[in-house]
Amino acid sequence: MVVDVIPQAPVDFSESKVKQLLAKYRRAQAIKDQWIPIFEDCYEYALPQRESFYSESIAKRRSERIFDETAVVGVQEFASRLQSGIVPNYARWAEFTSGTEIPKDEQKEVNEMLDTVTEYVFEILQNSNFSQEVHETFLDCAVGTGCLLVEEGDAVHPIKFKAIPLPHLLLDAGHDEKIDHIFRERRIKFRQILNAYPNAKLPVRMMEEMGKNPDKECKLIEIVYRNYNNTKEEEYQFCVISETYEAELFSQTFKGMGSNPYLIYRWSKCAGEVYGRGPLQLALPAIKTSNLVIELILENAQMAISGMYQVEDDGVINVDNIQLIPGTIIPKAVGSSGLTPVQPAGNFQVSDLVLRDMRQNIKKALYNDMLGTPNEKTPMSATEVAERMADLSRQIGAAFGRLQAELVNPVLQRVVYILKKQGRIQIPTVNGREIKIRSSSPLAQAQQQQDVATLDRFIGMLQARLGPQLTNILVKQNETAKFLAKKLGVPEELIRSDKEMGQAAGQIGEMVQGLQQTGMQPRDSINALQNITK
């Protein structure tokens, strides 16, 4: 017997909703508790300045256990290298282009319009705090998971970015293993609640506590979760609840692509896991080993400087009264040897070999040791810079695809969503068909250099076998120029359209005929341009 299952609508009772959300929050907390020991080790050895996952006082010194700073410096360089390769400052690291549903004869006009939109979007990004905040998220990405909050701003700053530390974040995944529940723990003073959430409705007990202690901090939980009942478009529910008072203070619905303000991205992940795994987790054994080796070296150095001594227990020398300082007179019994230095056992010469290997492994895991160390005396050439970026692109190819899908595209979709909401731009929906996002960052261009190299080899082989004239006839020069411009990120307005190419070719033909009538031979450059009309 076949039974039709009728989907049930979610219960609207506020109290029941709060209990359900708190149950999901505690389940997400249980998932995170399994990861906290790994996260805390990464923070302790490589990010000691970051907030701990355990309750600690503000500005507590956490660097006492760090003896080797290779990982501390390396993770900062990793974040800077990642930022310069994917979202470099004051550069267009992506662009909007026409999708597959736009007719080819209209794509150039649409791309020129989208190029103007791209310029405005990146002007907004460059005048915002995006660069500062995304660097903070890249530090968390080294551990495995980063979070960037993108909110609507004011008239001066239309968009505000905020890096959410991993200790404040709890995640849960849905049926497709995509993150569909985001919990942010936030401590805020009572008097600041209505400033942060102007339309919040506070329960009576919270209002009474606010009147008594307005500067007292309370814990709130911001929740964003996916509403799967809406199958036509993306829909998210945003709400703020208090675990202490078991009440919902504020709720809001977000609809459309780019409406989710929380952007979660991961370096890599294993199947079935919610949180990502970053390069710091891979390098953690080497980090601990090098830290221990340096600690032992320092202990051995202290032992070599201060020395160890043995003394005969003759009842004359009282070791508690001896101070090893210049000018000290130490009595000794007749016939005894007094204080005798003890030679330490062990050979610390092997420590240099172990330490060198461990440091090299750490730098390699954090992608800081590529093609050797640049020569400080000689500045890097453009070819060397391009080759180093290509080497980085080859090493992080898999992670780059995930960062493109979970960070770059969502950031631009979110920015476009906010700017459209504010009426600053007019653009169709960015859904991959009408309009698509194409990355033009240094890492993306380094990956596309393979296509350019393939074209160069193809044309070189044709010229070697058939000669340059027949090659010009076989290869479409104008299409080749468009292909190279697309791969190298050249703006669309710099390339002539087919109509403009025809007009230019006609003018060149008239010039050639005029030169032939005067008996002069046309120049090689004119011959090359004339081949465009063939």
Which sequence ranges carry the predicted segments?
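Short, mixed-charge, low-aromatic patches
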Residues: 68-80, 89-95, 104-107, 242-251, ...
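Short, hydrophobic/amphipathic alpha-helical patches that form generic packing surfaces
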Residues: 73-84, 284-293, 299, 460, ...
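Extended, helix-rich architectural segments
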Residues: 1-209
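Structured, contiguous alpha/beta core segments that scaffold functional sites
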Residues: 14, 151-324
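Charged, low-complexity surface segments at secondary-structure and domain boundaries
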Residues: 7, 94-111, 119-126, 265-285, ...
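C-terminal anchoring/interaction modules
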Residues: 1-47, 51-56, 308-534
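Generic hydrophobic, helix-prone segments enriched in Leu/Val/Ile
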Residues: 78-83, 130-141, 220, 262, ...
